[in-house]
């Protein structure tokens, strides 16, 4: 595939006008960093019941970057849920029904954050203010 075909393909797939592709990619990169930061904070906090808060917060922060950030948050969230659908039964001993319910709740929190709603709705009592 030559370069021009690749660029046109990206514009069609990403749904971005040629005038905004640079901004979109910048927002997507920043959104990916927001998602990574929320994931790192979740691991650091290691706080029972806080995972939905971090899902919502990562998506919220990323989506605030703009369309590119919202796109990155959705792609990352969907990929994460797909991977967890495979690994959770193997490594956490979860049943398919448990995985399905957890994924549904995670996706609800993801969409909550991406839609601009306050992620603190999912914040558990006692989670340190640092987060």
From Swiss-Prot:
<dbReference type="Pfam" id="PF00277">
    <property type="entry name" value="SAA"/>
</dbReference>
<keyword id="KW-0732">Signal</keyword>
<dbReference type="GO" id="GO:0034364">
    <property type="term" value="C:high-density lipoprotein particle"/>
</dbReference>
<dbReference type="GO" id="GO:0006953">
    <property type="term" value="P:acute-phase response"/>
</dbReference>
<dbReference type="InterPro" id="IPR000096">
    <property type="entry name" value="Serum_amyloid_A"/>
</dbReference>
<comment type="function">
    <text>Major acute phase reactant. Apolipoprotein of the HDL complex. May have a role in protection of the mammary gland during remodeling and infection. In vitro exhibits antimicrobial activity against Escherichia coli, Streptococcus uberis and Pseudomonas aeruginosa.</text>
</comment>
<feature type="region of interest" description="Disordered">
    <location>
        <begin position="94"/>
        <end position="131"/>
    </location>
</feature>
<feature type="signal peptide">
    <location>
        <begin position="1"/>
        <end position="18"/>
    </location>
</feature>
<protein>
    <recommendedName>
        <fullName>Serum amyloid A-3 protein</fullName>
    </recommendedName>
</protein>
<feature type="compositionally biased region" description="Basic and acidic residues">
    <location>
        <begin position="94"/>
        <end position="105"/>
    </location>
</feature>
<keyword id="KW-0345">HDL</keyword>
<keyword id="KW-0964">Secreted</keyword>
<dbReference type="InterPro" id="IPR052464">
    <property type="entry name" value="Synovial_Prolif_Regulator"/>
</dbReference>
<keyword id="KW-0011">Acute phase</keyword>
<comment type="similarity">
    <text>Belongs to the SAA family.</text>
</comment>
